[in-house]
Amino acid sequence: MTAVYAGFWVERRTEHGVVQALPADAQGFCPKRPSVSGPRNATDCVMFAGNCKRKEDKLVQSFYDTMIAGQRYMLILQGLGFTILIAVCAILIGTVLGCFFALMKVSDRKILKGIANFYTTVLRAIPLATQLMIFYFVIFAPLGMNRLLVAILAYGFNSGAYCTEIFRAGIQGIDKGQTEAGLSLGLNKNQTLFKIILPQAVKAVLPTYTSEFIVLIKETSVASFIAVMDLTKAGDMIRNATYNAWIPLLTCAVIYLILTIGLTKVFGLLEKRMAKSDR
């Protein structure tokens, strides 16, 4: 029986033919398996744990130096307060304006439809940051109005344009047979609208309305264009003071995420309760 090396393999000649095999003395020719990183014994485990502990301590110290020292976290809380205040006040203004202009859009009078169409077209076409600066530097500049109030009005009017289309779609999405049924019961057109159509429209538009509120919260991040210290501006101020960007900005991102998820859950529960009331 003879063996001839051919690369890594050896030809072993037998009476049945040629069989390829990898002999023991050829193991050195095989490529080695990559070593597995990580601790392999007790000493390595101790060193690995020590490295993790040092990194954790460094992260905690970095967070303390950036956010806790100098009470910079108060800037985040203050910015969060302004963000929530702007968003809540703006969505209330937007809801009122949206209802008003939506009713104008579904009316039979062309002049009312024209006014509502002009409002929604202009406010939805111009970027929000541009509207914000127009409100502050042009419209309300002679009055010297407070920046925060100007921001609330600008966001409210912008939200109103989107709420108008949301409510209009909800009203027109209700089957016309509902209106005919109300009229057949002796209700006039306005009574039918407010007692039959609008309650059904509210349930239909709730998911879209929730999305508008969430978008509005995120859009408050451009309030700093007129020097309003919203949540994002607070994070940027901490970044400028500490030269550490990722901790304050990541903190702001997590807060926005919590607000968004929280609102989604709250409105989801409200939607479920309204759905149960129909049964």
Give the role of each language-model region.
Residues T2-A3, T14, A21-A26:
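Short linear motifs in low-complexity or flexible loops
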Residues A6, G17, A26, A42, ...:
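Short hydrophobic alpha-helical segments enriched in small aliphatic residues
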Residues R12-R13, R33, R40, R54:
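Basic polycationic patches enriched in arginine
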Residues Q20, Q27-P31, R40:
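Charged/polar low-complexity intrinsically disordered segments
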Residues R33-S35, V60:
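Intrinsically disordered, low-complexity segments
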Residues P39-L59:
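Short, Lys/Arg-enriched N-terminal segments with co-localized hydrophobic residues
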Residues K53-R279:
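Transmembrane alpha-helices and adjacent helix-loop boundaries
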